């Protein structure tokens, strides 16, 4: 079984990417505080890279900005690619399949005021979650 649940804040505004075959995708990092203090008495933060596809990606880009607090459920995925220096890079990320909006902040807003989250979607369109 490959399942993960996260609650964290966006480190920056997510950006929607349009790919071939009418697919849309966004990726972002969530800042997640650990639930204990280190030997210096400080709380460490993990930065988890996440990827989202389809309508869910569109909703995230529309409603979430830097500092928004969300809950994300999905699966861990590893992949590799060759960068511009011809070095093979390995990456571990969470492919998000479900999101709960807890505290949303407007995108590109100086005062980062909270906005109302969209109503929960009772029926999922599973074709949006098919990966290439």
Where do the PLM segments sit?
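Beta-rich strand-turn-strand
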Residues: 53-89, 105
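Acidic, gly/ser/pro-rich intrinsically disordered tails
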Residues: 1, 18-21, 43, 101-132
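OB-fold and OB-like beta-barrel modules that bind single-stranded nucleic acids
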Residues: 5-10, 30, 66-78, 96-99
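Intrinsically disordered, low-complexity acidic/polar segments
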Residues: 17, 37-39, 59, 83, ...
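Core FKBP-type peptidyl-prolyl cis-trans isomerase
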Residues: 4-45, 80, 90
């Amino acid at each position: 079984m490959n399942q993960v649940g996260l609650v964290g804040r966006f480190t920056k505004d997510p950006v929607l990417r349009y790919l071939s075959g009418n697919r849309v995708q966004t990726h972002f990092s969530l800042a997640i505080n650990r639930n204990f203090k280190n030997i210096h008495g400080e709380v460490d933060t993990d930065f988890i890279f996440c990827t989202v596809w389809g309508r869910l990606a569109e909703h995230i880009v529309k409603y979430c900005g830097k500092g928004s607090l969300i809950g994300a459920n999905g699966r861990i995925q590893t992949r590799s690619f060759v960068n511009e220096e011809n070095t093979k890079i390995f990456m571990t990320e969470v492919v998000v399949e479900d999101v709960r909006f807890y505290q949303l902040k407007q995108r590109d807003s100086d005062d980062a005021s909270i906005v109302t989250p969209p109503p929960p979607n009772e029926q999922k369109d599973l074709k949006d979650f098919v990966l290439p």
